Amino acid sequence: MLIFAICILGAMSTWAKEKDSDSLNYEHGGSIWEVDNIALLDNDIKNEIDCTIENIITPEMSDYDKVKAVHDYIVLNCEYDYENYVNDTIPQDSYSPRGVLINKKAVCEGYAAAFKAFMDELSIPCKLVSGKASSNGDFTGRVNHAWNRVEVGGVWYQIDVTWDDPVPDQKGKVRYKYFLLSDEEMNKTHLQVRNEKKI
């Protein structure tokens, strides 16, 4: 059995795959789902991704253009689930691509998982990263956080779609402060505490 686990915002997420099985089990906060693909939890999410790609991606786009289009789409169409975050009542969907794509509200794990799901569909190498984040670089006592690494033009960059989405939500506003940063740049505010996993 292959098992991958990360702890985000104080809750453990676990992906497990039996050796001779095509399905995966996803567990978060005590709930377990069997999924056909680790990033695409069900058909309506896959359909939403496919439809979105059809609308925002064109054949002549470079990988950079595709990454930017997906980044912008997520920021413009999802709102950080701040109210549930501060009340410690985050629903399961907010940790997944479903929160971003269907409910239009998510926390960092949902943003990162949705971004990875898009990259998987576009065949752009991408990894989910977990760690801690702090705008001032002081990681003492900071909450867990999730973001991504993505390969563009043969170079790996870090990207935090969550932190590029203004809170409170500002319709039509996209930031690029955490868009395709080098490891050195991202390490000023983000501390990876686990090995990144390609999922």
Predicted stretch roles:
Residues 1-5:
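Sec-dependent N-terminal signal peptides
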Residues 8-20:
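Sec-dependent signal peptide cleavage junction
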Residues 17-47, 51:
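Low-complexity, acidic Ser/Thr/Pro-rich repeat tracts that form intrinsically disordered stalk/linker regions
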Residues 39-100:
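Secondary-structure boundary elements
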Residues 84-98, 107, 111-122:
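A conserved catalytic-loop motif detector
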Residues 103:
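Short pre-catalytic strand/loop immediately N-terminal to key active-site residues, enriched for Gly-Thr
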Residues 110-183:
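Hydrophobic/aromatic-rich core segments of domains that either
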Residues 182-199:
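Catalytic cores of secreted or luminal carbohydrate-active enzymes
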